[in-house]
């Protein structure tokens, strides 16, 4: 990696570290949202650099994961090991518990729980009185994220109103909120997918194995390769194939598609990303295909994304 490229990554790193420290200085009870995906892994590393002496000390705020019950097992194993080894506090909010308590209603055990997790997240934020939540969202991912500020204000119901965003001139952030309001904070807003992978290479960060090429049973559905699992079974007329694939994003098994790939290292993934002409969410996330405004609708309802 050239020195110019490293300098660019260090500038992005410095911007993110500044945002994280600003939130801790202005807000009382922040939390870091962690999915076990590449973006949240980079975000965790940035938080450790900002506040945890580069990872030698536990963070002064907890890590929150919304467990839908439809997660990839490899990601859950990585989540537990990564947080445990660093000594951070992990809070797991369960969608299944929300279903059991009647907070949300599930159409069927194999249906997507993407919409349901919003209620679980909002309940967890309220129960722990968190007033700021760090997320790994990036502006290059999707149009709704492209127009969202670094400090994304949510009302007392956790909802986002795009027309009520505050200006952020010269990296000046206003974190004043009323009781019950929240801020979702996106320190990695200016990263691209390629920046994320290059930062992973620079910092030699460990990732869940699903990010690299492996053989998996999949079915082709609506133009995506979905992994056969306890929540994805072949429909009538669908064939099960064993294919060399990897994942560009981490979401639920029910909505996250794989891509054909032979990339087994960070360097080879970087080469694939450099040649890709389709965004990661556009290629692999069924939850963003329901409508052109699917992500914005979820944000307005209070989603973590």
Write out the residue ranges for each language-model feature.
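Nucleotide-activated chemistry modules centered on ATP-dependent adenylation/adenylyltransferase
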Residues: 1-305
């Amino acid at each position: 990696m050239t020195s110019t490229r490293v300098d660019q990554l260090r500038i992005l790193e410095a911007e993110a570290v500044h945002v994280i420290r600003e939130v801790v200085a202005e807000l009382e009870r922040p939390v870091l949202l962690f999915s076990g995906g590449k973006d949240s892994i980079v975000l965790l590393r940035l938080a450790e650099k900002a506040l945890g002496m580069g990872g030698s000390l536990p963070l002064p705020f907890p890590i929150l994961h919304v467990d839908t019950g439809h997660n990839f097992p490899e990601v859950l194993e990585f989540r537990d090991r990564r947080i445990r080894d660093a000594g951070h506090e992990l809070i797991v909010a369960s969608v299944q518990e929300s279903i059991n308590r009647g907070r949300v209603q599930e159409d069927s055990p194999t249906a997507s729980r993407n919409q349901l997790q919003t209620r679980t997240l909002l309940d967890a934020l309220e129960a722990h009185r968190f007033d700021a939540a760090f997320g790994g969202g990036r502006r290059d991912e999707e149009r709704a994220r492209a127009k969202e500020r670094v400090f994304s204000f949510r009302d007392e119901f956790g909802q986002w109103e795009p027309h009520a965003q505050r200006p952020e001139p010269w990296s000046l952030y206003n974190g004043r909120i009323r009781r019950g309001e929240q801020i979702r904070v996106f320190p990695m807003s200016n990263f691209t997918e390629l920046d994320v992978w290059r930062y992973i290479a620079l910092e030699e960060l460990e990732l869940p194995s699903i990010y690299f090429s492996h053989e998996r049973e999949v079915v082709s559905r609506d133009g995506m390769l979905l992994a056969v699992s306890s929540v994805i079974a072949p429909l009538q007329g669908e064939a099960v194939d064993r294919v060399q694939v990897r994942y560009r994003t981490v979401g639920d098994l029910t909505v996250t598609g794989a891509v054909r790939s032979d990339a087994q290292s960070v360097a080879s993934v970087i080469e694939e990303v450099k040649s890709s002409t389709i965004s990661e969410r556009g290629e692999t996330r069924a939850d963003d295909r329901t409508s052109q405004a699917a992500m914005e609708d979820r944000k307005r309802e209070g989603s973590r994304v």
